[in-house]
Amino acid sequence: MARYEDLPYRTCVGVMLINAKGLVFIGRRAGGIEHIDDTHVWQMPQGGVDPGEDTWAAAKRELYEETSVRSVERLGEVPDWLIYDIPRTVAGRAWKGRYRGQRQKWFAVRFTGKDSEINVENPGGGHKAEFVSWRWEPMKNLPGLIIPFKRPVYERVVKEFSALAEE
């Protein structure tokens, strides 16, 4: 097995889905290897980029696969790739031990549909549910709801997209 320091980062995308009131979609994770406590179980949709896939296409696909949402308008993109490391204690189990963390490209999108379009229990494309529930949350609260090792990424995403938040 490769040393933790030598492992690559998994290439991923993240999506900040913002409603007409400026609130952000967050989903309560269904558990998984990263689950460390019951207070930091919320996150925005995110997932891997397929080989040869454009990051914007990947963002729309991941959003659909996790929320069933297709009614969006692109608002912005964080210019840099944001990186986080997963704790060494779970690195051997997460992603079959192939990655030390993720490098993410983040997009902000306006939700133009109705809340009834959102379905996290039976998401689009027949994919396994990653969330067990969801809610709209003020953007400024997001870093405090995410698992601690992802917090710096969320702080940067909130900073980049803060002008899109509710008044």
UniProtKB/Swiss-Prot annotation:
Top EC class of this enzyme: hydrolase
Record GO terms (molecular function): bis(5'-adenosyl)-pentaphosphatase activity; guanosine-3',5'-bis(diphosphate) 3'-diphosphatase activity
Matches recorded under CDD domains: NUDIX_Ap4A_hydrolase_plant_like (cd03671)
Alphabetical UniProt keywords: Hydrolase
Superkingdom, taxonomy of origin: Bacteria
SUPFAM superfamilies per UniProt: Nudix (SSF55811)
Enzyme Commission number(s): 3.6.1.-
A Pfam cross-reference name: NUDIX
Domain Nudix hydrolase: from-to ranges: 8-159
Cofactor: a divalent metal cation
GO terms for biological process, alphabetical: nucleoside phosphate metabolic process; ribose phosphate metabolic process
Segments carrying motif Nudix box: 47-68
Family recorded in the similarity comment: Belongs to the Nudix hydrolase family. RppH subfamily.
Function description: Accelerates the degradation of transcripts by removing pyrophosphate from the 5'-end of triphosphorylated RNA, leading to a more labile monophosphorylated state that can stimulate subsequent ribonuclease cleavage.
Protein name: RNA pyrophosphohydrolase
Lineage: Bacteria, Pseudomonadati, Pseudomonadota, Alphaproteobacteria, Hyphomicrobiales
Gene encoding the protein: rppH
